[in-house]
């Protein structure tokens, strides 16, 4: 939760910073500034990772991993499959919601300059959700936390559809907590289902499933939006999110 929270701080601050620079100097300066910062960060990371300090011994890790069962090290195939399915729905629904949120607000009559604020407060709530839900999972358990966050996400989207612009802006940080909080709970659970020697592979597979769904979902829901409109699309999205509830219940005996 803490690790994911630190990363989401960037998601909360960058949209607001980009909106500020865009308002002062135009979107080209904002895009170029972001590109330069990212490039400098990449160079810094390259030199930091070049240090061999703390690297595990390769042959020993490989020989131990070969004794971990299947090539992926998944100790509970059913549990990993259920967890990955929930992650795919959760990640895909998050990218779809963030894609269509500006269009929903514009349809409600919001000004264009409010879009940066809307995304910023949503990401801020999401950053807090990563931190808060990680601690809630320790107290309530994984299943109960997922049930609460996914229910709150689905119902929150339906409520957002009915609200005018100003109340919707106040709802967005709360919705962001639920929308983004589930992922920190799911990430921590992967380690329990994969052998320690194969966790890099297990996490790689898990992230690939989620990122792939996150990339495919917006175009697919875009087709629905073209046919039925943004409000109907987000209502369908809320229904899809709620399908994670029975999946989370099935995860309990897994």
List the model feature ranges, each with a label:
Residues 17-25, 105-106, 136-137, 221-228:
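Interfacial helix-cap and linker-helix signal at transmembrane-aqueous boundaries
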Residues 181-194:
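Intracellular juxtamembrane helix-capping segments at the cytosolic ends
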Residues 161-171:
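Helix-loop junctions at membrane interfaces in 12-TM secondary transporters
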